Amino acid sequence: MSGLRIGLRKRLALDLFSDLYAAKVREHRLDALFWECTLRCNLSCRHFGSDCRVDPGVRDMPIEDFLKVLDEEVTPHVDPAQVLVIFSGGEVLVRPDLERAGAEVTRRGYAWGMVTNGLGLTE
């Protein structure tokens, strides 16, 4: 099985790469987490990246599902004070529970913001 053996030089290069890759994985920091919380929109912009419609035929993700992912998959691995949660879509202001979502994210220690066209703002 001499075909499986590699030379010392290649072995050292692979070990070095492996160490560098592991260090890179350890150093990677999550700074921003985008939640595309709706595909609904009150406009139909041609230039926008998401396929957004007034009624896209897809239900919005329930807040509880997002918070479960945040609690179980994100929070154990980050300092919430160092991560910005960004609500995006579609148009986030079409969600009637957006204020509750923001309050729940804040209660968990995260800062948050949103991407909006602003048409739903009244004050």
What are these regions (language model features)?
Residues 5-123:
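Conserved alpha-helical substructure of the radical SAM core
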